[in-house]
Design a protein with these regions (language model features):
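Recognizes extended acidic, P/S/T-rich segments that occur
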Residues: 429-464
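A well-ordered secondary-structure block
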Residues: 114-197, 206
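Cellulosome-associated attachment modules in secreted, modular CAZymes
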Residues: 395, 436, 476, 482, ...
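Pro/Thr/Ser/Gly-rich low-complexity, intrinsically disordered linker/stalk tracts
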Residues: 393-422, 489-492
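Metal-dependent phosphoester-hydrolase catalytic domains
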Residues: 8-10, 156, 175, 181, ...
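N-terminal, active-site-proximal structural segment of metallo-dependent hydrolase catalytic domains
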Residues: 6-142, 177, 202, 217-229, ...
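Acidic, glycine-anchored loop motifs typical of Ca2+
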Residues: 107, 111-124, 317, 497-505, ...
Length: 551
């Protein structure tokens, strides 16, 4: 996949800058939005949850966003009035998400009003155009993922995403039991990242484990997390081998036919409904990252290298509060987990408007028609954000020079130089020099990855009979590579070689005489004054005596 331009990066919250340190960092956001993104909710700009969530997403600009508790019209309290007091269908929620990101006319609220609060209104250069709505529901809500980059089938199972899975027992891995991923499922979406910026692609997992403190709730969360761990290890890691689900325990049909590339991480996030710091047991987050082993660093974890994966310890940048629900400082229920042998955490944080100094509010909050510190109050959870450094791509390749051919002679003084499109390219640069190592170039030109893949050298740079060297380099996040063709050369034609055969002879004299009779013609105008006259004849006579156009 070719890359799109990225917004300038910046991280300085005290100065209202909540962006990434590096534009190529990959930002993951997970957010339990407490039922507020549903088809019957009012979508007009105001002091309401819809607007509050939209300005937060616009401020954070995630590369991928997991939202849970979506589509619950009943719990949101708007379903009955609109005659749809139930969970949104996949199609209905997909339309609602498009309205949330892009605006439009609301087909689900009486009167079909225009949607006036939406993400791209508040962040016009940002978009989340690719969406997956889980087909799993507890008859209340659904999990969703929105992506800046397109979804793609990365493991050969003819799907770009799944909403859940079912496992049979595996005697070789007895830490989990047969069953599914829990009451709301656990989605995985496969994302195709730009090849010129990243060495691999990305898999985003997301879900909302069962809430509650009863023994049945605790048990369901634990067994679901153990199954999630096995699914990640078997399907995406191949249990350490090169074949997905080698023990045939996963219910994926059609079955995947390849594991992920070594530079493609799996990251999973959501509301796990337990705080690993104070739950008094090895909870669901720990199980999904560690799998069976009880000791850190063992060789059966969910990381690609079979060690343990990692999970975040995000804090509010201003208060160091780790809480993601309510006001209790020790109530972190929302987590981001990742395969740390591939994805390196740059930073993570809890995004909480209510504790920001007034000098730290992101510019997008200015669009909220109310007090900024009330924005957090419209949902009972806070967004958790993590920025990852992903593997760099290989340097570009395949940008082959096409012409003029190496060692070409008798070219005009404004030749067109061409090459083919390469792979994994962010930009090209054409260089022309009088030196074979391209040092001290007389002409350079940057070219975007989209081309054009040929450029004409401007007038006034090349001299008759001059020999010049040229090539094209291609650059991406991984580095710069000269064309595999190397450096080519060409020679400009002699000044008076009108028929371009390498000689100034009788044939050229006949052509010059014709031009001399015409007077106002460029054919014999060797001195560039606009006329073919006596001054040009003197030049021609000297060249005629030498015979070779370029002695």
């Amino acid at each position: 996949m070719s890359g799109a331009s990225l917004a300038p990066a910046q991280w300085n919250p005290a100065n209202r800058q909540w962006g990434k340190d590096d534009a190529d960092d990959y930002r993951v956001v997970t957010f339990n939005i407490q039922d507020r993104i549903c088809s019957t909710n009012l979508k007009q700009e105001g002091q309401n949850a819809w607007t509050a969530i939209a300005v937060q997403i616009a401020a954070l600009k995630p590369d991928v966003l997991v939202m849970v508790e979506c589509g619950d019209n009943n719990a949101n309290g708007t379903g009955a009035a609109q005659g749809y007091d139930t969970v949104d269908t996949v199609a209905r929620l997909t339309t609602t998400l498009n309205l949330f990101v892009h605006g439009g006319t609301d087909p689900y609220v009486a009167g079909n009003p225009a949607v006036t609060a939406y993400v791209t209104k508040y962040a016009p250069t940002f978009d989340l155009p690719y969406m997956y709505v889980s087909d799993q529901t507890d008859n209340f809500n659904r999990n969703v993922v929105l992506s800046r980059f397109p979804l793609a089938d990365l493991n050969g199972d003819a799907r770009t995403a799944i909403g859940t899975f079912t496992l049979s027992a595996d005697a070789a891995n007895p830490y989990y039991t047969a069953g599914n991923a829990g009451v709301r499922g656990f989605l995985f979406a496969e994302i195709n990242l730009p090849d010129d910026r990243y060495g691999g692609d990305f898999v985003m997992g997301g879900g909302h484990l069962k809430s509650g403190g009863a023994s049945g709730d605790l048990s369901e969360r634990l067994v679901a997390s153990q199954r999630i761990a096995y699914y990640i290890d078997a399907i995406f890691n191949g249990l350490g081998g090169n074949t997905p689900d080698p023990n045939f325990r996963c219910s994926n049909f059609p079955r995947p036919n390849k594991v992920l590339t070594a530079q493609t991480p799996v990251v999973w996030a959501g509301d796990f409904n337990e705080d690993e710091l104070n739950n008094g047991r090895d909870g669901p987050v720990l199980w999904t990252t560690r799998a069976a082993a009880t000791s850190p660093g063992a060789t059966d974890g969910t990381d690609r290298d079979r060690t343990d994966s990692s999970y975040d310890d995000s804090r509010d940048p201003f208060t160091n509060n780790r809480n993601t629900q309510g006001s209790n400082a020790n109530n972190k229920l929302d987590y981001i987990c990742w395969q740390d042998s591939i994805a390196v955490l740059r930073r993570s944080f809890v995004f909480r408007a209510s504790t920001m100094p007034s000098t730290a509010t992101p510019p997008e909050f200015a669009n909220f028609p109310g007090l900024y510190f009330n924005i957090s109050a419209f949902t009972d959870h806070r967004a958790v954000v993590a920025d990852f450094v992903l593997p760099s791509p290989l340097v570009p390749s395949g940008h082959v020079l096409t012409g003029p051919a190496d060692f070409s002679q008798n070219l005009g003084k404004q030749p067109t130089l061409g090459w083919t499109a390469g792979a994994r390219v962010s930009s090209y640069q054409l260089a022309v020099s009088t030196n074979s190592d391209l040092s001290s170039p007389i002409y350079t030109a940057p070219v975007p990855s989209s081309g054009p893949y040929s450029l004409q050298i401007p007038a006034g740079l090349l001299a008759n009979c001059g020999t010049y060297y040229w090539s094209v380099s291609a650059t991406n996040r991984g580095g710069t590579a000269l064309s595999p063709s190397g450096v080519w050369s060409f020679q400009v034609r002699g000044l008076c070689d009108i028929n371009i055969d390498g000689f100034v002879d009788d044939t050229d004299f006949v052509l010059f005489a014709t031009a001399y009779d015409l007077f106002e013609t460029p054919d014999g105008d060797f001195n560039g004054d606009g006329f073919t006259d006596d001054a040009d004849f003197v030049l021609f006579a000297n060249a005629y005596d030498a015979l070779l156009a370029c002695p």
